[in-house]
Amino acid sequence: MFYNFISKDSILYRLILCFGIGIGTVFGLSPFSFFSAGVFASISCIFLFFSLNRTSIWKAFLWLLILSQILNFTAFYWIPGAISRISGVNTFVSILFFFLYGLISHLKFFLFYTLFRFSKIDSASKTYILLIFPAAGTLSDMITFQIFPWYWGNLISGSIVFEQFASICGVYGLSFLLLFISSTFLILVNYYKYKNSKEFKTSIASLICITFIYGFGLYRIGYINQSQNELKPKNLSVLMIQPDTSPGTKDLKADASYLSATMSKVFSLAIPTFENSPSLIVIPESAIPFHGTIDSEENRKEKIYSSTMEGIILYLSKHTGADVLFNELNLDENKLRNQVSLFKNLDGKTERYNKRRLLPFGEYLPMEKNFPFLRSIFQETSRYVPGEFPKLLIGNKIQNQRSFLPPEISKLNEPKTYRYEFSSIVEHTNKIRNLEYSYSILPLLCYEAMFTELVLDYFQNEQKPEVLINITNDSWFDSELEAYQHSGAVRLRAIETGLPLIRSAVSGISEVWDARGIPMIVPIGFHETGTRAFSIRLDAIESTIYTRFGNSFLWIFCILILISRLIFVSRIERKS
């Protein structure tokens, strides 16, 4: 009936499908998280691809270009403002960059469609689509570059039960699952009147597979909660702060009143007001911008070292007996690093992780060597140098730690006083005697947490992480939708690894999830100032299948499906 009014080859029909993908995407992602919206987006994609198969490949690519911009404006409309604030460009450049971003970030549709087109599936009622469509979509998710990555698997966030499949196949496995569910739905709709047909029976078999995956999700949600190590539980008490300070633009770097107000706010929030002190204090990215705590000649020369910032970190640890996780900038052989640092109360030493995945045009300027004039356009862009290796941060929980006030709170800008106290041999010996356990943190700085590959490489070594901590600064984007989309994408890392995940954002949303991706606290909302004190269990029994094998099996499976189909198509064409 629908096709009596709108032709499958018409511009209107294709525009409706493009908007169907865009609207389905925005409502499939957080904060809406409608599972049906994700299915709607993928079904719209199927029908768009079939419509494009009836035109030339160049016209099809033109439509995919249109799709990329429709997706931009429906789901990621916050990007132009973010570009302007992060890099300091004017409105014209930010809009121009927005269009370019849409093309680059949605290149996966070009690969997705190309693989689908050459698979020669001429109808949504063909059972080949059950595997070809998911394999092509998943492979394009895994291969193509994205700036702020979103995957088809992110659109399944409306079902916490289906999301548990990520513990086996990761977010890419969820991409395959969503596209498989959508394909199965289409076959069922087409053949539900023909129950004796081969196609209907195939769709029922697919439905049984989906039911098994759902059953696994239910089992995992119940099993994880009962599989904690009760003999030697490792409970870590944490204080997380969200100061909601304004973005540290370069013109504020020399503003003493701004820096003083920012540091005071962080300091006042991080001093616990309850009797039981935390074992770990988590301070988000850029809570204290521009500065670091390494008192080196090059840091002093570039005015990066801040004695007050170091004094605050030392004071907090001394006052609470806690380790302190925070973000800082430091020069290392003339290379400016963006770091996650852990100050350890046990010995007064600091471990540091250098951020490996930098934000283009925000933290570094691509092609700056070839086009130096870009620096005059993107004036707020930083000059960070990426780290080379993953690094776990090892903290310690010490028994019988009591909160007390160190002397001379007025001397925060003279950290030597506090440094001396941490060097006491007697105190250090007592702490070692009272050491309850050590714990390992997998640090993720800002949008690094959106890339599953950056998490997987931590599981290749003997020492495994026990908790994931993502400290981030979303204040640059000034968009509640972005904050929710970012947070929703990060949550999957907890399910993939089977570990609790703490997300501490300077302006929101700050959340904590257990190994199933289920919230453990009431989140601190967007542009709220607040703290959360909570306890997490660190005694995961075993690694997930995904952390042991990664994406290897999914790569092989998808490639074999597509190669088999292409061989089959080429044989048919040769015979004809």
UniProtKB/Swiss-Prot annotation:
Q: What is this protein called?
A: Apolipoprotein N-acyltransferase 1
Per UniProt, what is one GO molecular function of this protein? N-acyltransferase activity
List the GO biological process terms.
Answer: lipoprotein biosynthetic process
Q: How does it sit in the membrane?
A: Multi-pass membrane protein
Any idea of its EC number? Answer: 2.3.1.269
| Principal subcellular localization | membrane
Q: Where is the CN hydrolase domain?
A: 236-538
What's this protein's function? Answer: Catalyzes the phospholipid dependent N-acylation of the N-terminal cysteine of apolipoprotein, the last step in lipoprotein maturation.
In the record, the note on similarity to other proteins reads: Belongs to the CN hydrolase family. Apolipoprotein N-acyltransferase subfamily.
Where does the UniProt annotation locate this protein? Cell inner membrane
Pfam families, sorted = CN_hydrolase, LNT_N
- Lineage of the organism: Bacteria, Pseudomonadati, Spirochaetota, Spirochaetia, Leptospirales
Any idea which residues are catalytic in this one? 285, 355, 446
- Keywords noted in UniProt: Acyltransferase, Cell inner membrane, Cell membrane, Membrane, Transferase, Transmembrane, Transmembrane helix
Q: Where are the transmembrane segments?
A: 15-35, 38-58, 60-80, 92-112, 128-148, 168-188, 204-224, 549-569
Q: In which pathway does it act?
A: Protein modification; lipoprotein biosynthesis (N-acyl transfer)
Q: Which GO terms describe its cellular component?
A: plasma membrane
